[in-house]
Regions:
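Catalytic cores of the polymerase beta-like nucleotidyltransferase superfamily
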Residues: 1-209
C-alpha cells in the first residue's frame, strides 16, 4: 500500500510513502473504477462504489472531484480518455469540478497531454471522450513545452470549440459543425493519423479568412 501528497507540481506527487491499510491506498486513486482490489482468494474488495459505477456506466472520482483534479491535472485528460475507453458517462460532480482545476493544466508537459489524447483517439467511444474534452472547455487550456531550455505555454486544441453550434448546410449535413466532426471521427477506423485527420478536417470552417 502507499499514499501520496501533492504540492506545486501539476502531475507528480511531492511525497510518496507506505500506507498501513488498503483504504488509505485506494482513497488516493483517481476514479472508482480504478479503486477496486482483489485479495489472494480472488475476492473483489470495493470500498468506493466501483462495481456500482461499472453497472451504471458512470465515471466518478474517488472522494472530492475538485480535490482529485487539483492534485493531478492530468486526471482531467484521463477522465476524457476513460469515458471514451469504457463508453461511460461522467458524473455531474466530475463535470462540475473539471473547470475548477483548469489553472493547473499549464503545468503539464505537452508530451503527457499528447499521450493521453492519442490514447483517447484510439478508444471505442472516441466521440464521447472528445465531447467531454471540448464541451468542458478543457481543449482550450494551454500546457507547457520546453524548447532550447526555455519553457512556454502552448494552446492544446482551442479551435475545436468554434465548431460547437456552427451551422451547416442542411442539404448536406444533419448536425452542427461539432457533432458532424464527431460522427466522422467515430466512423473512421482506429488509426491515429486517420482519426486526427478526421477530427481536424473542418476545424477552419466558418473562421475569418
Amino acid at each position: 500500500y502507499r499514499t501520496e501528497r501533492y504540492g506545486a507540481d501539476s502531475h507528480r506527487p511531492e511525497e510518496i510513502a507506505y500506507a498501513d491499510t488498503l483504504e488509505e491506498d485506494v482513497l488516493r486513486r483517481d476514479f472508482t473504477v480504478n479503486g477496486m482490489a482483489m485479495n489472494r482468494y480472488g475476492e473483489v474488495i470495493d470500498l468506493v462504489g466501483g462495481r456500482r459505477d461499472i453497472k451504471h456506466k458512470t465515471l466518478r472520482t474517488i472522494g472530492n472531484a475538485e480535490k482529485r483534479f487539483e492534485e493531478d491535472a492530468l486526471r482531467l485528460f484521463r477522465a476524457c480518455r476513460f469515458v471514451a475507453k469504457l463508453d461511460f458517462l461522467p458524473s455531474k460532480e466530475l463535470l462540475e469540478a473539471m473547470p475548477k482545476a483548469f489553472h493547473r493544466v499549464s503545468g503539464l508537459s505537452l508530451e503527457r497531454v499528447r499521450s493521453e489524447l492519442d490514447r483517447l483517439m484510439l478508444a471505442p467511444a472516441v466521440a464521447k471522450g472528445l465531447d467531454v474534452l471540448v464541451q468542458s472547455r478543457l481543449a482550450e487550456c494551454s500546457c507547457r513545452v520546453v524548447e532550447n531550455g526555455a519553457a512556454r505555454e502552448v494552446p492544446i486544441l482551442p479551435e475545436l470549440y468554434h465548431l460547437v453550434n456552427l451551422p451547416q448546410e442542411k442539404d448536406f449535413h444533419e448536425f452542427d459543425g461539432w457533432y458532424h466532426t464527431l460522427a466522422v471521427v467515430s466512423h473512421t477506423e482506429p488509426d491515429l493519423t486517420l482519426r486526427w485527420g478526421a477530427l481536424l478536417h473542418d476545424v477552419a470552417k466558418g473562421m475569418p479568412t
